[in-house]
């Protein structure tokens, strides 16, 4: 009996991480076609995670990044459409709310069933591009797999059929469990000359925090004040786009804020579980803070955003929504 042909499309660090365990299982049970859109093309945002998580190379690389956002989105849809016509998958699997997920539009036009993991997340901030992507993909998907009851209720309230909506939880727990020994064994503190609980870890890369000038200035002014108040190193795992923006703005960071290229999966999580606090706008922070609390490595998770699509993390009390202003972040 022939296996069903499944096309799985990824394109960014969070998708690679969250889907890593799922991809391995899908290789066993399906004839899986693994596709990378190329949305994140830097080694430290891409290949290092394939290596850390033991993932095989994608079967196809779409090289979809264009000269601007419009061209990139167009390339993702057009190139995935052509590949689907060529490969004729029985189903499409996507996760999340990145531009790579807009490949679902191509699948819908080709009548290919769409399975969407991380469905139903809502932050109710229409200014965020991810919110637009979520609404588009959720409403054209054939099966929506939600992380929480919150997400399921949002979809049902928007009219999505209940028989198409399931609460599966996040695949992140399996990924972290499988890698916990390697995370704990990382020697990144020694390599960077850091002491446990005597540094903060910073990650700031979201479009609304980096590209909007007022938000950018408010946020990094807050970070400088944080360094001055606590007088400890702040290790900034800095996305290339964020570094480019810092340079272009000529913003002077406090000398205690240390820029570092994006870190690998094991090193970054070792830094999180040993930090005095983690200050981040990362989409994986809610799951990471919840997981490490459950295995005896809790850390204060301070989310530098004004909204969140993960209210279940707030319910658990391991994750705080701080905003980006000086008073909010420090408090």
Give the predicted meaning of each segment.
Residues 39-44, 63, 140-213:
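A nucleotide-sugar donor-handling region in carbohydrate enzymes
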């Amino acid at each position: 009996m022939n296996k069903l042909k499944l096309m799985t499309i990824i394109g960014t660090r969070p998708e690679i991480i969250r889907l890593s365990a799922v991809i391995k299982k899908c290789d066993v049970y399906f004839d899986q076609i693994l596709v990378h859109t190329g949305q994140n093309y830097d080694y430290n945002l891409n290949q290092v995670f394939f290596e850390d998580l033991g993932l095989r190379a994608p079967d196809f690389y779409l090289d979809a990044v264009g000269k601007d956002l419009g061209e990139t989105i167009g390339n993702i849809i057009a190139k995935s459409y052509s590949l689907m016509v060529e490969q004729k998958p029985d189903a499409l699997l996507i996760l999340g709310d990145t531009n790579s997920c807009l490949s679902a539009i191509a699948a819908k036009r080709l009548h290919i069933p769409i399975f969407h993991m991380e469905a139903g997340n809502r932050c109710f901030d229409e200014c965020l591009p991810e919110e637009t992507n979520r609404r588009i993909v959720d409403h054209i998907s054939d099966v929506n797999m939600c992380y929480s009851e919150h997400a399921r209720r949002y979809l049902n309230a928007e009219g999505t059929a209940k028989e198409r909506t399931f609460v599966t939880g996040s695949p992140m727990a399996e990924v972290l469990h499988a890698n916990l020994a390697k995370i704990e064994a990382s020697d990144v503190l020694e390599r960077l000359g850091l002491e446990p609980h005597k540094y903060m870890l910073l990650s700031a890369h979201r479009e609304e925090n980096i590209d909007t000038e007022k938000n950018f200035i408010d946020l990094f002014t807050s970070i400088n004040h944080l360094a001055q108040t606590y007088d400890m190193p702040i290790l900034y795992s800095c996305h290339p786009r964020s570094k480019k923006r810092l340079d272009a703005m000529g913003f002077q960071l406090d000398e205690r804020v240390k820029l570092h290229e994006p870190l690998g999966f094991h090193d970054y999580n070792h830094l999180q579980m040993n930090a005095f606090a983690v200050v981040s706008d990362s989409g994986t922070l809610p799951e990471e803070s919840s997981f490490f609390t459950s295995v005896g490595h809790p850390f204060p998770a301070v989310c530098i955003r004004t909204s969140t699509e993960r209210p279940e993390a707030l319910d658990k009390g391991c994750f705080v929504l701080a905003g980006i202003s000086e008073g909010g972040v420090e408090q």
